[in-house]
Amino acid sequence: MVVAMAMANNGSLSPAPPAAFQEPPPDYTENGRLYHGLHKGKYMFPCDEDEKDRMDIFHKFFEVAMGGVLHSRNTTFTNNYDGPRILDLGTGTGIWAIDMADKYGSDMGTGEVLGLDLARIQPPTIPENLQFLQRDIESPWWGLEVESWDMVHIRMLSGSINSWPALYQKVRRYLKPQVGRFEQVEIDFTPRSDFGDIPADSALATWARNLFEATRRNFRPLAYNTEIRAMLQKEEFLDIQEEVIRIPLNPWPDDPQEKDVARWYNLALTQGLEAMTLGPMHRIYGWTKDDVTRLITEVRRDICNRKIRAYNNLHVWTARAPVKPPS
């Protein structure tokens, strides 16, 4: 069906998959958590029901943190008779893609949304203008049409990508020249405090250091990529903009909006600590599940302690495709 969409838009197709292309291997269990079988071990985070709940909580958090919108107000679409064509990379449970399909299927006629992810964890009942494919976004995008997407969306893929420059090059190639929009939303999990509330030997600081190093050794660092602007500039993206939003780890601020953001972030983070930590610590450092449980119990205590006035930063990047695609 993706190929049919491509032909309808007269785009040039990426090469077809090789004849030996096979169904991905089954998912597998490790330390009581379910992980996807496609490119086993490459992605360190689980894909079970608890993880799906975490992803959906994070979706609500992002919506609250961004002022109740599904995408940045900087991301606008040109008039398009058929509605915008939107590509969601690393779609997870597909909840953002579903909301976008509902919005642009009703608001703008026949907008189309396609979500790609390593794991098939999306619901079976979805809007008619939405499709999900099980794909590794770092591999060739078989059958997708180049220069034909109005928006490419990335959210929370730190820790999953080996080469950001290669991914940005693909994004540029598949966006409509000059009018296609790119949006990337990432959390910098570095614990910060303007009041000196985070000792270097605290559980929170120790957790972040160890997790950053473990994912770096896996060649897919969770640490925030500080070179995003330079990488987008190298691909000649236009109108590059960054919005930084402070996200408190618990409701310690006085501002009501920040308190609301903090409540959702605290829920998402405390719910997701095991999922974020278990795979990297076990596979890289050889920690047992009990080792991880002890650490994240202390980290939760720090995260929920209102005397620790800590926060992370949420980065929202937007850009417009260059006039000409790469040669």
From Swiss-Prot:
Disruption phenotype: Impairs the ability to produce oxalic acid, to colonize the host tissue, and to form sclerotia.
EC number: 2.1.1.-
InterPro entries xref list: SAM-dependent_MTases_sf
Biological process (GO), any one: methylation
Catalytic activity: L-methionyl-[protein] + S-adenosyl-L-methionine = S-methyl-L-methionyl-[protein] + S-adenosyl-L-homocysteine
Broad class of the protein's primary localization: nucleus
Keyword Transmembrane helix attributed: no
Pfam family, one: Methyltransf_23
Database matches in CDD domains: AdoMet_MTases
Cellular localisation: Nucleus
GO annotations of cellular component type: nucleus
Domain of life of the native organism: Eukaryota
Family matches, as SUPFAM superfamilies: S-adenosyl-L-methionine-dependent methyltransferases
Keywords attached to this entry: Methyltransferase, Nucleus, S-adenosyl-L-methionine, Sporulation, Transcription, Transcription regulation, Transferase, Virulence
Molecular-function GO terms, alphabetical: methyltransferase activity
Family: Belongs to the methyltransferase superfamily. LaeA methyltransferase family.
Reported function: Methyltransferase that performs automethylation. No other methyl-accepting substrate has been identified yet. Component of the velvet transcription factor complex that acts as a global regulator for secondary metabolite gene expression. Controls the expression of the oxalic acid gene cluster. Also controls the expression of proteases and carbohydrate-active enzymes. Regulates sclerotia formation and plays a role in virulence.
Subunit structure: Component of the heterotrimeric velvet complex composed of LAE1, VEL1 and VEL2; VEL1 acting as a bridging protein between LAE1 and VEL2.
This protein's name: Secondary metabolism regulator LAE1
Organism of derivation: Botryotinia fuckeliana (strain B05.10)
Lineage: Eukaryota, Fungi, Dikarya, Ascomycota, Pezizomycotina
